[in-house]
């Protein structure tokens, strides 16, 4: 940190850091708080910002007021991103929980998203195991295990086999 930046008030330095973090991608409020509290790597090693709890609260409030920090927008974008990468609803819920998003906000966003989880599970299975999907029991178990690991629900996985003749 240069001499001129070390003289800036802690609030201004925290606000600058928050805007830089949020400029890269959306974050949940909990993620932003964690990143703001982490030491900054400077030329001479890690440097702490001597900020009070009130400074952190003011920065978070400012980010909310100016639209930089919005948990509902973060959740919607996170669900869309993770589903495009082939992850199922159970895994996405778990990751959102780890990021500090409430169960109510997660469930609301999951209901509002327009994703056919069964079709997505089938796409993942055919991408990994080929078309047509194997009918041998041991191969079905492998596919089921793979899809469960990816976060798909058992009912969506079973639907693949029910609609297999289609």
From Swiss-Prot:
GO BP term, example: SOS response
Q: Where in the cell is it found?
A: Cytoplasm
Query: Which InterPro entries does this chain map to?
Result: RecX_HTH_1st, RecX_HTH_2nd, RecX_HTH_3rd, Regulatory_RecX, WH-like_DNA-bd_sf
Q: Which cysteines are joined by disulfide bonds?
A: none
Main location, first listed in the record: cytoplasm
GO cellular component annotations, sorted alphabetically? cytoplasm
| Pfam families for the chain | RecX_HTH1 (PF21982), RecX_HTH2 (PF02631), RecX_HTH3 (PF21981)
Q: What induces it?
A: By DNA damage, via LexA, as part of the SOS response.
User: What's in the keyword line of the UniProt record?
Assistant: Cytoplasm, DNA damage, DNA repair, SOS response
Q: Which GO terms describe its molecular function?
A: enzyme binding
Q: PANTHER family given for it?
A: REGULATORY PROTEIN RECX FAMILY PROTEIN
Function per UniProt: Modulates RecA activity through direct physical interaction. Can inhibit both RecA recombinase and coprotease activities. May have a regulatory role during the SOS response. Inhibits DNA strand exchange in vitro.
Family to which this protein belongs: Belongs to the RecX family.
HAMAP family, per the entry: RecX
Q: What is this protein called?
A: Regulatory protein RecX
